[in-house]
């Protein structure tokens, strides 16, 4: 595989707590909370360490965003649940945490002619009047890459960092095969 490094920029994880939550009771009892039902159907609870935001919904669903590694994402969810438990809200001990999306960035180290890439590479969308990047959809791994003329890449839709890395590596190799970049 080609030598390319990725940097995880954001991880989105979710948990279903199996119990509805009384947001009007929870919101005033927590610090660093934004709660305005007219603007958003849940409350936003910000943690400082790890620096994340947890979206808490009345249905008992929780979404954590902002972590740079899976461990921090899981830790943030557990910290959020512990804070809710401190408010005399019973939450089952066992609940499932799912990684929904990992966003990673990379640099191919080469300038890309996106018009040529759009013509030669399958499963792409490129509308420079709408967005400066080219959208490239891979089926294995099932990720979406945004390619920019500078050679910078953003990978989204991965469930693991390895999937994101593989997506970027396969893309670089395909671009080399099509003579769209040099090795």
From Swiss-Prot:
This protein's UniProt keywords: DNA-binding, Repeat, Transcription, Transcription regulation
Any one GO molecular function term: DNA binding
Keyword tRNA-binding appears in the UniProt entry: no
Sequence repeat extents: 8-84, 99-175
Function of the molecule: General factor that plays a role in the activation of archaeal genes transcribed by RNA polymerase. Binds specifically to the TATA box promoter element which lies close to the position of transcription initiation.
Family according to the record: Belongs to the TBP family.
Protein name (Swiss-Prot/TrEMBL): TATA-box-binding protein
Native organism taxonomy: Archaea, Methanobacteriati, Methanobacteriota, Methanomada group, Methanobacteria
Gene name per UniProt: tbp
């Amino acid at each position: 595989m080609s030598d390319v490094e990725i940097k995880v920029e954001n991880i989105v994880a979710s948990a279903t707590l199996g119990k509805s939550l009384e947001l009007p009771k929870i919101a005033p009892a927590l610090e660093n909370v934004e709660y305005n039902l007219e603007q958003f159907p849940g409350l936003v609870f910000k943690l400082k360490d790890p620096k994340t935001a947890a979206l808490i919904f009345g249905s008992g669903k929780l979404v954590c965003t902002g972590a740079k590694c899976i461990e921090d994402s899981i830790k943030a969810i557990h910290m959020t649940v512990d804070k809710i438990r401190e408010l005399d809200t019973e939450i089952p001990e066992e609940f499932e945490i799912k990684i929904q999306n990992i966003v990673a960035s990379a640099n191919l180290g080469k300038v890309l002619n996106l018009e040529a890439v759009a013509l030669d590479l399958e499963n792409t969308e490129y509308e420079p009047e709408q967005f400066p990047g080219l959208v490239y959809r891979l089926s294995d791994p099932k990720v979406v890459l945004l390619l920019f003329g500078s050679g910078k890449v953003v990978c989204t839709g991965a469930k693991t960092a390895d999937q994101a890395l593989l997506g970027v590596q396969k893309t670089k190799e395909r671009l080399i095969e099509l003579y769209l970049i040099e090795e």
